Amino acid sequence: NINKLKKLIERNEEYPGANYIIRPDGKRKKITLELKEEIINALVSGYKVERHLQNGDVVLFNRHPSLHRGSLMAHFVRVLPGRTFRLHPAATFPYNADFDGDEMNIHSPQTEEARAEAKILLDVKKNLFSPKNNTNLIGCKADAITGNYLFSLDEFTGEEANQILFKSGID
């Protein structure tokens, strides 16, 4: 595990890397080119490494104002090119997001307890229905419904449908 962390420190700001370490005495240090070798040599059990988000990490996603439970939910990271958050259209309803410049926030739980709590209580898959009136919070939107309908027509062969899906990024 320490060797894996040393590799992250070596990569530093290059993804996937790490930007900070926290020493056992609680002091936080930024990893710089000048300090990188010193930090790698000093790294022992007890140090914490603040690494970049990686595929599978749990994060909390919300949009202000957080008026109800669905305004803050846990999602799992899938790292893609670019420096933006991306949200599946089926998960937009509880956030009242409509892709017109909505400001969203992402938070990374810092302890094992917080990560477990996020997975158990806040996971999108466990919050499909509104606790207020038992209606769906997550579901297909207009474009997905229309697209599924069009795919169900006999106008496309299976091969053509697969090519369309593949070119749209679904493999």
Locate the predicted segments by residue:
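Flexible, glycine-rich loop/tail regions that form catalytic "lids" or insertion modules at the edges
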Residues: S66-L67, S130-D171
